[in-house]
Amino acid sequence: MGSLSIWHWIVVIAVVLLLFGRGKISDLMGDVAQGIKAFKKGMQDDDKAPEKTEPVKSIDHGATPSATRTDVGSKAV
C-alpha cells in the first residue's frame, strides 16, 4: 500500500504530459539548463583575480585649523 506500482507512475506521467504538454516541459528544462550555465559562469568569474588595480591615493590634510564649536541660541546659566 505504501509503494506505487508501474501503473501509478504511468498515470502520473500521462497527467503531467496532458497538463503541461511536451513543449512546456522542454522549455522549462531549457530554462533550467540556462540558469545552471549562468550560475557556473558566475562562479568562475568570482574565482578570477582582478586584472590590475590602481594604487590608493591618499589626501594630505596638512595642518588645518580645527573649528571651535559654538552653540547658537543657548543661554549660559
UniProtKB/Swiss-Prot annotation:
* Top-level taxon: Bacteria
| Cell compartment(s), UniProt | Cell inner membrane
Alphabetic keyword roster: Cell inner membrane, Cell membrane, Membrane, Protein transport, Translocation, Transmembrane, Transmembrane helix, Transport
Name of the protein described by the UniProt record: Sec-independent protein translocase protein TatA
Q: Which gene encodes it?
A: tatA
| Signal peptide (UniProt feature, chain positions) | none
> Where is there biased composition of kind Basic and acidic residues?
43-60
Q: How does it assemble?
A: The Tat system comprises two distinct complexes: a TatABC complex, containing multiple copies of TatA, TatB and TatC subunits, and a separate TatA complex, containing only TatA subunits. Substrates initially bind to the TatABC complex, which probably triggers association of the separate TatA complex to form the active translocon.
Report the membrane topology from the UniProt record. Single-pass membrane protein
Does Zinc show up as a keyword for this record? Answer: no
Q: Does the keyword Membrane apply?
A: yes
| Single GO term (MF) | protein transmembrane transporter activity
Q: Which GO terms describe its biological process?
A: protein transport by the Tat complex
Q: What family is this protein classified in?
A: Belongs to the TatA/E family.
The family database entries (HAMAP family) matched by this protein are listed as:
TatA_E
What Gene Ontology cellular component terms go with this record?
A: TAT protein transport complex
Q: Which InterPro entries match?
A: TatA/B/E, TatA/E
Segments passing through the bilayer: 1-21
- Predominant location category: membrane
